[in-house]
């Protein structure tokens, strides 16, 4: 049968078929095991890039595989649709953010459909729609009700380019994660979520996630940053003020020779002596314009100013000078440290620069007792010295003894500190979920009642590059009445960080049309947690941490039954071109639309899944795409040619009296079933699964040429070849499945199970090569040894003919695989 592989009409045909038949639509079914498969939903930028294609192709293989294995598969898609780019586009192009966003969604949805992804589009959601952000606001109210949402004045990260506040996690190397502008510090009233209340649970429960990459768990562990130590107070000389510090090394408290406050510390102004005031103010001012990275980098020069004030060491009564310095930050610990230059390198460098004494209190093997003789700090183990009654104790013993002494004397207490800070969620922008709070002169901050949600984001608004939220300029939005007393009041004009919207969207997918509550309890109890989550490692801290926090909170208020949102996590690598991440600025972007138009979605999917294991970076290769296209063309020709011989045959259950060639084809078929099943189901080794399918195709192609093929064996091989290939390249497999006499969609077929009997071999096929080029394929006894294989190869008619008159230099034998005759 001579039919051309017309991928365009084939792909359009089957995409329409799937949609019309609603093949991917699912409901809860207690009779079937569920499988919730989710790729991180995208920001609707308007165009898919190759990273999207890879992410969604990986997810689709898993979804199709699980469905064919009898699971009730939930595979939804939606849009993380609030955010700054829409607002910037509005200002730049005089177009409303909603118009820009919905237009982008339509285009990206069309592109996704051309990829043939098995999404249940009935569950589509967009976080910018009122029926969604109504419940984002509900989440805020619940957090507020439970004392986990609060407002305070804080030194915040301000992006002068985006004109908004950023969370700590959105600042990378002192710059805005999105636009790379250097951030500034500003004092602003901001809303926070108290994620720190969950720090220990977020840390402990990483142990419940064996299906997560260790790298991601380590990143979260480091971000939470648990440290054990003690917190104690020091009185300030000639003042009623008290200074509180946290230290992980209470054993070194006798070695404190100066204290350091962060320049932003509220005590700086109160304790500064008049003669130091000018210098201190100048230094504080200078620090306002330095980002955290520049201040705390190990390469950064340590700078500071003496305040003129002294603290009293509660352990020995010594006077300790109080400095301010660039390397101490207000938002870590208490914003104050005890400096022990003999045993901390940063303190040591600072002390040497400003001629501050260095006192040794931990003696290692070669540590001099005289601090003046130290060339660098000694942070290691040893025994306490110069420490009064604690002399002679080991570091570990000393830490316990000092904490015990402090607790008995009421000086301090053992405590745990975390690097994790509360989540700053206020954004001074328009295109986000409005914060449902009203400020009343009589009642103070008042929550908008639940029955009044959603608090709508006004659509008709003037877009200008304001230095504050545009909502502040819209009287009909911010002027309101107090829900409590009815008097005139003002609305909060900040909107929520978009990460709030994405911290619970996976719950909403379980029942996206629910109008009275965020999700149906019955639905989330059936579907949650997500069984497989797929997305980039760049979300390891931000999104994944926030999603875990929300899930634990929703469990605590008894609306969810699970405490972790994602059972397994796959972080796929990037798609590179010329060894660099694809980007417009580098001019190395490959358009998925062009690739699909030229080669088809099946080819694009096959290449991107074959070129590299999913967790590794993938180098784009035009030759690789062409190779995938050639393979699909070969499959098309092969199955088309075999179709007439098998389309009217029933599937055989028994295969008696097979000759060696038929046995070998059955062996290859069932070995491939076993390999592909394990590679997809256990390891996500899609590249090796595809390689095995290619080998089966080659074996089938070779078998096709024999005089009297066993058609039931051929049918079994063809049917399984198509089923195994269908999660990777579904359109061509649907078409060939139909062509070979099947009425029902290949998607509805059961995944095959291998026959152990077929894997018991008397003979196996090996390749015969001459100088690395394949010249023949032959059947040999399964237990043939090296010498026997050498003899078989040299006696082979093709090998003898092609090596006549040549010198055979050596024979390379790989038992069970090949014999390579090297001749010259």
From Swiss-Prot:
Keywords: Aminoacyl-tRNA synthetase, ATP-binding, Cytoplasm, Ligase, Nucleotide-binding, Protein biosynthesis. This is Leucine--tRNA ligase. It comes from Syntrophomonas wolfei subsp. wolfei (strain DSM 2245B / Goettingen). PROSITE patterns: AA_TRNA_LIGASE_I (PS00178). A motif ('KMSKS' region) lies at residues 581-585. It catalyses: tRNA(Leu) + L-leucine + ATP = L-leucyl-tRNA(Leu) + AMP + diphosphate. Belongs to the class-I aminoacyl-tRNA synthetase family. It is found in: Cytoplasm. ATP binds at residue 584. GO terms for biological process: leucyl-tRNA aminoacylation.
